[in-house]
Amino acid sequence: MCIVKTLHLITHVMKEYNSQFTEGSDFSLIEEQILEFWKENNIFKKSIENRDEKRRFIFYDGPPFANGLPHYGHLLTGFIKDTVARYKTMAGFRVDRRFGWDCHGLPAEMLAEKELGVSGKLAIEKFGIEKFNNYCRNSVMKFSREWKQYIDRQSRWVDFENDYKTMNLSFMESIMWSFYQLWQKGLIYESIKIVPYSWACQTPLSNFETRIDNAYRQKTSKTVTLAFELLDAPKSLIVDNITAYKILVWTTTPWTLPCNLALAISPNIKYCGAIINKEMYIFSRAYLKNFEDHCRKNNIEYLIHNGDICYLSLEYLSYKPVFNYFIDIKNAFKVLVADFVVEDEGTGIVHMAPGFGEDDFILCKKQGIPDIDDKDTSKLLATICPIDDGGKFTERISDFVNMHVFDTNDQIISILKAKNLCFKTDQYLHNYPHCWRTDTPLIYRAMSSWYVEVTKIKNRMIDLNKDVNWIPSHIRSGQFGKWLENAKDWAISRNRFWGTPLPVWKSDNPNYPRVDVYGSIKKVFDDIKALEEDFDIPIDDLHRPYIDNLVRPNPDDPTGKSMMRRVTDVFDCWFESGSMPYAQLHYPFENKELFENYFPADFITEYVAQTRGWFYTLFVLSTALFDKPPFKNCICHGVVLDTQGQKLSKRLNNYADPMEIFKQYGSDAMRFLMLSHTVSYGGDLLLDKDGVMVRDVIRNVIKPMWNSYNFFTIYADIDKVNARVISDLDEVDNIMDKYIMCECISTIQSIFNAMEEFDQSVGNYGYNIKAACNSIVQFFEVLNNWYIRRCRSRFWSSEITKDKVNAYNTLYTVMYYMVKVSAPFLPAITEAIWQKLNFQEEESVHLSLLPNIEHITLKDEDQKNIQYMKLIINICGCVLSIRNVRNIRVRQPLNKITIYSYNNNDLFNLPVKYQNILLDEINVKSIVFKSNIEDIASFQLKLNFPELGKRIPEKMKNLISLLKSNQWKILENGQLMLGIREGEHYILEDNEYTLNLKVHSEFASTITLGPNLLGVLVLDNTLTDELIMEGIARDIVRIIQQSRKDNKFNVSDKIDVVICTQDKMVKNSVQAWYEYIVQQTLSLSLVIYENLDANNVAEYCKTTMKDRNLTLFIKKL
């Protein structure tokens, strides 16, 4: 079986780097050298150009805004993107990584307003739209240089030279085209609707923008319950001595009361009345308790009216308005019936302000309130929504003119009290939507906007969503699927300045209506209207105000007086980012074949909230334009927070500058921390400020990999070995070599499975970066702490034997393959090792291909080798645990270990060669196997009652009785039987019980492998003099080796050793184990004294062994 097609004869050559790094800052230095190597040798460019153009892997790099610095969320997204792109490149694909910039929209405008000292649309218009937009254009890339520095330093490869910008003419023209296509498909319309409105930004928001970045947060509102006086008594409700009938209404927005035009009741609610001072108050029966509680608390005398009040007796009754601003409105101030009114909160009666509530608007429009033609949008909006762009009342609300609506609540309540209309006020804590740009509470207001009719294509979007592989998988039917099911039409227009303009021209005379929509600048397609064709002027900038100056006579006006003028709105910047797949290529004007052949994208990733942002807008436009999902695979990663679960912010000072972390520890450590965490597929990462978690990655991941390389180079240099990559597993005969080779192949396959295997039936969805990272960590743990440690004596051998060369070749081979397969996840450190080991296959590891193991099938004996080795590693861990708990030194030999097997043939029939490895590793002389496990442990059975209740709920009492009487048995086939075979009994399924073992000896431990119980081991702790002396000899070897290291001796240096002690057991030990000690420590002489003149060892290095009253001296020869 061939691992590679050709035999690699590769000479190991050390390069200029120091191989003995100890601190994280050293790894940072290595990374900087590697970054320079990549740059000088154009490795990134070569990684693309070296791949076949016809074998592409497409991923979309979502455009960030460049008017702020990157944060940890950007870094996380970048790490995932770069890892997948590197992996697919090494899998043989061409992966273009074109970077993009989001240039338009509120972030740019808000920064410009702040720096220019202008605020609000009127101030901008006075300042000049041209000057304002030019400032936006020049400032939008303010931090692009810093972005490039961050991205480069995180070892992320992107193409900045061919980047796209949403403000580029080509990008904007593709957006025009897409709008035109939607218009032609009947998916665009203009309408007045209630929309979430940011008065701080003076613009409406999309409905999904109120659902991202935790836009909902707690807000305390002042509520009021007030009385509206009916002008007539309710039908069939004539009560003696009643002077007035009043309807109680509860509202959390007192500021909307000046704009009240109707009241709404429900046909599904029972109403009742209560009399106070000869006035009857009407409200829902569900509110009665609240009413009575308030009256008692405030000593208000009341009388409950007998019987219910039917909603029909209230319908269409007129009432006296609280304010007189709209007294002239026809059809207003009536009680209307509506299904949306509920009695969960409030009085079961709702006040209607059609300019500030969706239900209010729809109901009043249906009833002709106000009686204004929908075509006269300006008059209608001025009537029902009398506030300016900044959220202040206009002159129509004369008592509160120029006051912000939120600032009028107290005054309005005071007026209600003065008119004796206020029944009750309260503070109300509730979740309220805020502007995700400014953190200010939103207003819901009526506005005229342009919409994509998403509801028309909603069902198709739901169908296409089934074709997308979401990671984590629950996003498909959960967060994203539910969002699609409730999708609403999308308001895509913004009455702002810096953005792609809506390509819509309308007649300025409603008597001669006409609408023109354009889909291109020049005439390219016969069926698409072009701007230059109609306006007969060359166009090189689509931005305002230049585009607003394009005016022409209305062709449908025979008088020739009316003109076609552009609507002043610009696109929602989410429409622009959602157009990125085709707009970055200037489709369909250029790159038509390229786009159509490779759409949809293979992969995309952003944080999970983009299910209601970018992922959603991509999906809407892709479905509407191409009837396809926009991507095939999508990772929704989580959020990086501080250790208290709070967002990272400058105000809280709860995070470190990423660049400082990179400078101290390198970016590979931060990358691997994030990739190996659940944050890489939807969880949240709680990141400490001090870099402890990053240091842990250095210690637990990067150093083990580096130490493997370092170990090889040290001894290969000494022996001047020309190591080679082993090409055939069959040529490996050493059991440890065979094991680590098989483990390497198994690890590579597990990484491939994690990254590529898609099998929904078994829960595999590919792109499992965390699982791939875990496989890498586990392998290098085994390589360092098992293979290298177990094989050190082979490398230390003074002779260049075949076995020694085989060990070198084995270590070299697994490093070769593991460096390759780890490269996407640890790009810099693997590159450093690749360069240092001089594999001479490719100039860079990132230009090489992933290991080819398609033709490798591990034989049964290979699989068994792995199984046996994992078993003894597990047993070693159990023995070490007992030694630690019982304070028995690892170097102290013990006489015997007894293993009691529990239904495990591997444990009972462990081959002798594995027994020998086990005994040597745990420092025990002999091993005994037994099957009577009950002699040393007792079983404890625990039933899983929820699972049993699903299958045999009627037998639960019987099962409990049998369990209490301890009537159960493990059958020969491994099944568990509760009861006795001759009588009542039940065979339990694996998930219906747990079987534990309780050991009876303090020197015993259960043996498990994964979830499976294998048996029990017992350690014999009896010590003889011979065992004690051997332990002392091993301790002496350890302190000699430590002294060599402390004094910076080379591993090949020969030494003299002098021991001074009066301990008889130590002297006997040295005598008995002399050859062992000198061989292990490269000692040419070893002398022991009871007393010693210090002058005789003045040139020696001194150390002590206190527990044996021993002083040791060594000298390099």
Curated annotation (Swiss-Prot):
Reactions catalysed, as given in the entry: tRNA(Ile) + L-isoleucine + ATP = L-isoleucyl-tRNA(Ile) + AMP + diphosphate
EC number: 6.1.1.5
Compartment list: Cytoplasm
Function: Catalyzes the attachment of isoleucine to tRNA(Ile). As IleRS can inadvertently accommodate and process structurally similar amino acids such as valine, to avoid such errors it has two additional distinct tRNA(Ile)-dependent editing activities. One activity is designated as 'pretransfer' editing and involves the hydrolysis of activated Val-AMP. The other activity is designated 'posttransfer' editing and involves deacylation of mischarged Val-tRNA(Ile).
Enzyme class: ligase
BP terms from Gene Ontology: isoleucyl-tRNA aminoacylation
Binding partners and assembly: Monomer.
Binding positions (ATP): K650
Domain comment (free text): IleRS has two distinct active sites: one for aminoacylation and one for editing. The misactivated valine is translocated from the active site to the editing site, which sterically excludes the correctly activated isoleucine. The single editing site contains two valyl binding pockets, one specific for each substrate (Val-AMP or Val-tRNA(Ile)).
Keywords, ordered alphabetically: Aminoacyl-tRNA synthetase, ATP-binding, Cytoplasm, Ligase, Metal-binding, Nucleotide-binding, Protein biosynthesis, Zinc
Motif, 'HIGH' region: chain positions: 64-74
Protein name: Isoleucine--tRNA ligase
Entry keyword Chaperone: no
UniProt cross-references to HAMAP family, sorted A to Z: Ile_tRNA_synth_type2
Sequence motif 'KMSKS' region, location on chain: 647-651
Gene Ontology CC: one annotated term: cytoplasm
Pfam families tied to this protein: Anticodon_1, DUF5915, tRNA-synt_1
Natural source organism: Ehrlichia ruminantium (strain Welgevonden)
Superkingdom classification of source: Bacteria
SUPFAM superfamilies: Anticodon-binding domain of a subclass of class I aminoacyl-tRNA synthetases, Nucleotidylyl transferase, ValRS/IleRS/LeuRS editing domain
Coiled-coil positions: none
Cofactor(s) demanded: Zn(2+)
GO molecular function, one term: isoleucine-tRNA ligase activity
